[in-house]
């Protein structure tokens, strides 16, 4: 049975080591009505996801401890989190990076810099398609 959630109360976990990015995204999404939690360490990301139980994850690829691909795999290996959509946020835009992000379980790929409005559109689209609104 597919769970239905309201977009306005969806929980978003932002995993990025750049405070200027996380601050902007957290503020914008909170003002849009989302419940937002931030994790700056990729090593702690899977544990934070298990604790927070997000409806969607925003994940940077270039992180210092583990890259976003490894982090995505760690999250997807958890049975409780396996179906949570992951949107990669990255400064990388090579075709092989995009392909690899999908191969490890990512659902979308957004290149930095991005507009908050576009990010919101993509989050809404992913939530609607995942949770069958």
Q: What would you call each of these model-derived segments?
A:
Residues 23-31:
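Charged docking surfaces used in two-component/phosphorelay signaling
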Residues 33-40, 48:
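Short hydrophobic/Thr-rich beta-strand motif most characteristic of the beta2 strand and flanking loop
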Residues 63:
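Receiver (REC) domain active-site loop signature in two-component systems and cognate sites
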Residues 114-124:
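C-terminal output helix
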């Amino acid at each position: 049975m597919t769970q239905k959630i309201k977009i306005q109360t969806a929980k978003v976990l932002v995993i990025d080591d750049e405070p200027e990015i996380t601050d902007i995204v957290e503020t914008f999404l909170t003002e849009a009505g989302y419940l937002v939690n931030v994790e700056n360490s990729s090593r702690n990301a899977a544990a934070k996801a298990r604790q927070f139980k997000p409806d969607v994850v925003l994940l940077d690829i270039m992180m210092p401890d583990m890259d976003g691909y490894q982090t995505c795999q760690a999250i997807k290996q958890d049975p409780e989190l396996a179906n949570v959509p992951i949107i990669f946020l990255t400064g990388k835009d090579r075709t092989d990076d995009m392909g690899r992000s999908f191969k490890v379980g990512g659902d979308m790929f957004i290149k930095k810099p991005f507009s908050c409005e576009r990010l919101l559109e993509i989050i809404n689209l992913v939530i609607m398609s995942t949770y069958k609104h």
